[in-house]
Protein backbone atom coordinates (compact mmCIF):
# COMPACT_ATOMS: atom_id res chain seq x y z
CA UNK A 1 0.00 0.00 0.00
CA UNK A 2 1.36 3.48 -0.82
CA UNK A 3 2.83 5.08 2.31
CA UNK A 4 1.22 8.45 1.60
CA UNK A 5 -2.37 7.16 1.31
CA UNK A 6 -4.74 5.92 4.02
CA UNK A 7 -6.32 2.47 3.91
CA UNK A 8 -9.77 4.03 3.49
CA UNK A 9 -8.54 5.95 0.44
CA UNK A 10 -6.75 3.04 -1.21
CA UNK A 11 -9.36 0.33 -0.51
CA UNK A 12 -11.63 1.37 -3.43
CA UNK A 13 -8.59 1.34 -5.70
CA UNK A 14 -9.01 -2.34 -6.48
CA UNK A 15 -12.75 -2.34 -7.15
CA UNK A 16 -14.07 -0.36 -10.14
CA UNK A 17 -10.54 0.44 -11.24
CA UNK A 18 -9.61 -3.18 -11.93
CA UNK A 19 -12.60 -3.48 -14.28
CA UNK A 20 -11.59 -0.23 -15.98
CA UNK A 21 -7.97 -1.31 -16.32
CA UNK A 22 -8.95 -4.69 -17.79
CA UNK A 23 -11.10 -2.94 -20.41
CA UNK A 24 -8.40 -0.43 -21.32
CA UNK A 25 -5.70 -3.09 -21.59
CA UNK A 26 -7.90 -5.35 -23.71
CA UNK A 27 -8.45 -2.45 -26.13
CA UNK A 28 -4.68 -1.78 -26.17
CA UNK A 29 -5.15 1.96 -25.84
CA UNK A 30 -2.09 4.08 -26.59
CA UNK A 31 -1.10 7.70 -26.15
CA UNK A 32 -2.94 10.05 -28.51
CA UNK A 33 -5.92 7.78 -29.13
CA UNK A 34 -9.49 9.02 -28.66
CA UNK A 35 -11.75 7.39 -26.08
CA UNK A 36 -15.34 8.03 -24.99
CA UNK A 37 -16.29 6.99 -21.46
CA UNK A 38 -20.02 6.69 -20.86
CA UNK A 39 -20.81 7.09 -17.16
CA UNK A 40 -17.74 8.90 -15.87
CA UNK A 41 -19.03 9.47 -12.34
CA UNK A 42 -19.35 5.80 -11.35
CA UNK A 43 -16.67 3.64 -9.75
CA UNK A 44 -15.59 2.18 -13.10
CA UNK A 45 -16.01 5.34 -15.17
CA UNK A 46 -14.21 7.68 -12.78
CA UNK A 47 -11.28 5.25 -12.67
CA UNK A 48 -11.31 4.81 -16.45
CA UNK A 49 -10.98 8.54 -17.11
CA UNK A 50 -7.93 8.79 -14.85
CA UNK A 51 -6.28 5.61 -16.11
CA UNK A 52 -6.78 6.66 -19.73
CA UNK A 53 -5.23 10.06 -19.05
CA UNK A 54 -2.24 8.36 -17.41
CA UNK A 55 -1.70 6.63 -20.78
CA UNK A 56 -1.96 9.89 -22.71
CA UNK A 57 -5.35 9.24 -24.32
CA UNK A 58 -7.75 12.04 -25.24
CA UNK A 59 -10.93 11.46 -23.23
CA UNK A 60 -14.51 12.52 -23.85
CA UNK A 61 -16.77 11.61 -20.92
CA UNK A 62 -20.51 11.64 -20.26
CA UNK A 63 -22.12 12.58 -16.96
CA UNK A 64 -25.32 13.96 -15.42
CA UNK A 65 -25.82 17.75 -15.47
CA UNK A 66 -24.69 18.29 -11.86
CA UNK A 67 -21.20 16.79 -12.21
CA UNK A 68 -19.35 18.26 -15.25
CA UNK A 69 -16.72 20.04 -13.14
CA UNK A 70 -16.01 16.87 -11.19
CA UNK A 71 -15.45 14.94 -14.42
CA UNK A 72 -13.15 17.66 -15.74
CA UNK A 73 -11.14 17.44 -12.53
CA UNK A 74 -10.78 13.71 -13.13
CA UNK A 75 -9.02 14.65 -16.37
CA UNK A 76 -11.66 14.53 -19.11
CA UNK A 77 -10.77 16.71 -22.09
CA UNK A 78 -14.43 17.11 -23.07
CA UNK A 79 -17.64 16.48 -21.14
CA UNK A 80 -21.06 15.59 -22.56
CA UNK A 81 -24.11 16.40 -20.41
CA UNK A 82 -26.42 13.43 -20.90
CA UNK A 83 -29.47 15.52 -20.03
CA UNK A 84 -28.79 17.86 -22.95
CA UNK A 85 -27.21 15.61 -25.56
CA UNK A 86 -27.43 12.02 -26.81
CA UNK A 87 -23.80 10.94 -26.82
CA UNK A 88 -24.48 8.26 -29.43
CA UNK A 89 -25.14 11.08 -31.94
CA UNK A 90 -21.77 12.71 -31.31
CA UNK A 91 -19.97 13.85 -34.47
CA UNK A 92 -16.57 12.65 -33.27
CA UNK A 93 -15.32 9.09 -33.75
CA UNK A 94 -13.29 7.10 -31.26
CA UNK A 95 -10.78 4.28 -30.95
CA UNK A 96 -12.70 3.02 -27.91
CA UNK A 97 -16.17 3.54 -26.50
CA UNK A 98 -16.09 2.36 -22.89
CA UNK A 99 -19.62 2.00 -21.53
CA UNK A 100 -18.87 2.05 -17.82
CA UNK A 101 -22.53 1.82 -16.79
CA UNK A 102 -23.64 -0.72 -19.38
CA UNK A 103 -26.68 1.31 -20.42
CA UNK A 104 -25.97 1.57 -24.13
CA UNK A 105 -25.23 -1.07 -26.77
CA UNK A 106 -22.88 -1.87 -29.64
CA UNK A 107 -25.69 -1.17 -32.11
CA UNK A 108 -26.14 2.37 -30.78
CA UNK A 109 -22.42 3.10 -30.42
CA UNK A 110 -21.11 1.46 -33.59
CA UNK A 111 -21.27 4.68 -35.60
CA UNK A 112 -19.00 6.34 -33.02
CA UNK A 113 -16.16 3.91 -33.68
CA UNK A 114 -13.28 4.49 -36.03
CA UNK A 115 -12.38 1.59 -38.35
CA UNK A 116 -10.78 -0.95 -36.05
CA UNK A 117 -12.35 0.73 -33.03
CA UNK A 118 -13.73 -1.16 -30.03
CA UNK A 119 -16.84 -1.08 -27.88
CA UNK A 120 -16.58 -2.48 -24.37
CA UNK A 121 -19.28 -2.57 -21.71
CA UNK A 122 -19.41 -3.30 -18.00
CA UNK A 123 -22.59 -5.34 -18.56
CA UNK A 124 -23.75 -8.27 -20.69
CA UNK A 125 -25.81 -5.96 -22.91
CA UNK A 126 -29.31 -6.41 -24.40
CA UNK A 127 -30.25 -10.10 -24.38
CA UNK A 128 -26.75 -10.86 -23.02
CA UNK A 129 -25.33 -10.22 -26.48
CA UNK A 130 -21.93 -8.73 -25.62
CA UNK A 131 -20.03 -12.01 -24.98
CA UNK A 132 -21.31 -13.42 -28.28
CA UNK A 133 -20.49 -10.22 -30.18
CA UNK A 134 -17.00 -10.35 -28.68
CA UNK A 135 -16.52 -13.69 -30.45
CA UNK A 136 -18.02 -12.65 -33.78
CA UNK A 137 -17.08 -9.02 -34.43
CA UNK A 138 -13.26 -9.43 -34.31
CA UNK A 139 -13.56 -11.74 -37.32
CA UNK A 140 -14.94 -8.81 -39.32
CA UNK A 141 -11.87 -6.70 -38.45
CA UNK A 142 -13.62 -3.36 -38.65
CA UNK A 143 -15.48 -2.37 -35.50
CA UNK A 144 -15.60 -4.85 -32.68
CA UNK A 145 -16.95 -5.68 -29.25
CA UNK A 146 -14.58 -6.70 -26.47
CA UNK A 147 -15.69 -8.45 -23.30
CA UNK A 148 -12.69 -8.83 -20.99
CA UNK A 149 -13.00 -10.76 -17.75
CA UNK A 150 -10.91 -8.93 -15.14
CA UNK A 151 -8.65 -10.82 -12.77
CA UNK A 152 -7.33 -9.72 -9.39
CA UNK A 153 -3.69 -10.57 -10.07
CA UNK A 154 -0.67 -9.18 -8.25
CA UNK A 155 0.67 -7.27 -11.25
CA UNK A 156 -2.58 -5.36 -11.69
CA UNK A 157 -2.76 -4.52 -7.98
CA UNK A 158 0.86 -3.33 -7.98
CA UNK A 159 0.21 -1.20 -11.07
CA UNK A 160 -2.86 0.47 -9.55
CA UNK A 161 -1.05 0.94 -6.25
CA UNK A 162 1.82 2.70 -8.03
CA UNK A 163 -0.59 5.03 -9.82
CA UNK A 164 -2.33 5.85 -6.54
CA UNK A 165 1.02 6.50 -4.86
CA UNK A 166 2.13 8.82 -7.66
CA UNK A 167 -1.16 10.73 -7.66
CA UNK A 168 -2.02 9.75 -11.24
CA UNK A 169 -5.07 7.87 -9.98
CA UNK A 170 -7.22 8.79 -6.99
CA UNK A 171 -10.23 6.55 -6.31
CA UNK A 172 -13.33 8.73 -6.21
CA UNK A 173 -15.07 8.38 -2.83
CA UNK A 174 -18.60 9.65 -2.38
CA UNK A 175 -19.36 8.64 1.21
CA UNK A 176 -17.91 6.71 4.12
CA UNK A 177 -20.10 4.69 6.49
CA UNK A 178 -19.16 2.89 9.71
CA UNK A 179 -19.81 -0.84 9.73
CA UNK A 180 -22.88 -0.50 11.96
CA UNK A 181 -24.54 1.64 9.22
CA UNK A 182 -23.87 -0.80 6.40
CA UNK A 183 -27.58 -1.20 5.65
CA UNK A 184 -27.86 2.55 5.14
CA UNK A 185 -24.84 2.42 2.85
CA UNK A 186 -26.43 -0.28 0.69
CA UNK A 187 -29.64 1.72 0.46
CA UNK A 188 -27.70 4.76 -0.71
CA UNK A 189 -25.88 2.75 -3.37
CA UNK A 190 -29.14 1.20 -4.56
CA UNK A 191 -30.72 4.67 -4.83
CA UNK A 192 -28.64 5.27 -7.97
CA UNK A 193 -27.38 8.64 -6.74
CA UNK A 194 -23.86 7.72 -5.68
CA UNK A 195 -20.76 8.90 -7.48
CA UNK A 196 -17.57 6.87 -7.43
CA UNK A 197 -17.28 4.57 -4.45
CA UNK A 198 -18.93 4.12 -1.06
CA UNK A 199 -16.52 2.94 1.64
CA UNK A 200 -17.42 0.90 4.72
CA UNK A 201 -15.07 1.81 7.57
CA UNK A 202 -14.25 -1.02 9.98
CA UNK A 203 -12.78 0.19 13.26
CA UNK A 204 -10.88 -2.14 15.60
CA UNK A 205 -12.62 -2.82 18.94
CA UNK A 206 -11.64 -0.62 21.87
Name every feature range the model reports, one short phrase each.
Residues 1-206:
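Terminal helix/beta-alpha structural elements that buttress the NAD(P)+-binding lobe
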